[in-house]
Regions:
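Sec-dependent signal peptide recognition
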Residues: 2-10
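C-terminal motif of bacterial Sec signal peptides marking the signal peptidase cleavage site
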Residues: 14-16
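C-terminal cap/linker of serine protease catalytic domains
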Residues: 19-25, 86-89, 163-223
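A conserved glycine-rich beta-strand in the N-terminal activation segment of trypsin-fold
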Residues: 30-61, 67-73, 148
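Terminal peptide-recognition signature
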Residues: 56, 60, 81, 98, ...
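Mid-chain, structured segments of secreted extracytoplasmic proteins
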Residues: 66-91
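Flexible, gly/ser-rich surface segments that form the specificity/activation loops bordering the active-site cleft
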Residues: 88-147, 162-174
Length: 223
């Protein structure tokens, strides 16, 4: 697949509307997402969503700055930050094209939101300088604030985190045949890419004297 130099400019890092997700007050799927804020010097000025990764770390997007407890920012739009699990860990796995997905998170008014769609086979790149990180796509809606929240499969597994969205005008401008015909597209970082970033973090930590290697911290997975 050819690099999409225009995709970064066209994509919106969940700073605009992509269809209309619905509020989800009592849906069990919403329990996996929680709100995270920017820290100093922008304390509480910016917000996003996050999901637990293992007993000691949670994961959100890198474009949310100054997250308290952040210890590693990956090549892709992802960062790991210290956050103790307070409930059962989610199961993680790779997504499957064609399966039903639900994007979960919170909007700018702190209301729980979710948008349902179908996983597409199309993969995209957001930045030619990120080492070739590939992002998944689905046709469900997302809104500002959901960035970093989990993307769930029908079996309850987390298959990635919300990152960005593309409007119909964006899709027309990039001229991707495999994305044509959609009113909007949401972009997420798949589990496989998140796991690769975690392994890079583990390798980095293993070379720091006196710092425990986080690779031994388990994550729940059904793969």
């Amino acid at each position: 697949m050819r690099p999409l130099k225009s995709l970064l400019a066209a994509s919106v890092l969940l700073s605009g509307c992509n269809g209309m997700p619905v509020a989800s007050y009592k849906d069990p799927a919403q329990e996996q997402a929680f709100v995270v804020h920017s820290g100093c010097p922008l304390a509480l000025m910016l917000m996003g969503s996050a999901v637990q990764w293992n007993e000691d770390y949670a994961v959100t997007v890198k474009h949310l700055p100054f997250v308290s407890g952040s210890e590693y920012q990956g090549r892709g739009d992802v960062q790991f930050f210290r956050h103790k699990a307070d409930k059962a860990l989610p199961a993680w796995r790779n997504f499957r094209p064609g399966e039903s997905l639900t994007a979960v998170g919170f909007n700018a008014f702190y209301l729980p939101m979710q948008g349902q769609g179908q996983a597409l086979s199309a993969l995209v790149r957001l930045d030619a300088k990120d080492g070739g990180v590939m992002y998944g796509t689905h046709d469900g809606p997302t809104v500002v604030g959901m960035s970093g929240g989990p993307v769930l499969a029908a079996d309850g597994s987390v298959v990635g985190i919300n990152v960005a969205n593309l409007s119909r005008r964006d899709l027309e401008s990039i001229k991707r045949a495999d994305l044509s015909g959609h009113q909007q597209i949401s972009i997420f970082l798949p589990y496989l890419q998140i796991q690769r970033e975690w392994q890079r973090f583990a390798t980095q930590q293993a070379h720091l004297k006196g710092v425990p290697n986080p690779v031994h911290l388990p994550i729940a997975s059904i793969d």
